[in-house]
């Protein structure tokens, strides 16, 4: 007797989540303009027309990816600041952010999101998200505006350090070694 297999169908929401994860990786490598929706669909094992049933446009897909990315950063900061005194929150959030940057897709997607800001709709979403993040860090840390500004400045520098993979040349280049000492970059108050 032949054995039958039961194939479970993914819901549209499960499929959307799967596609977003694939698209984050694709956009991280090739950017908004350089990423093909055909390549995303192929990796997801679906047709391009089905992709466009789930996401009406490439921009809508990119923004869905950005929303997931944005929530990961917010959750990283919320978790890091939970249960610690406000004066320690920036240090904890900074360390958690450094760990988050170990994820190549997240690190590169963030840079690609900034690069995609030539599109006014994307720019508006990224700008609003950044403002929300600044407010969250200010609230969680209770830090003065100039300290929060320094925290975000250091975060942007960490993005560049990670994107350039300065750790790979730190043994040969003293300047790179110094810049790869991120704990010293996190504001203490």
PLM regions: where:
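Solvent-exposed, amphipathic alpha-helical segments
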Residues: 22, 26-29, 76-79, 109-113
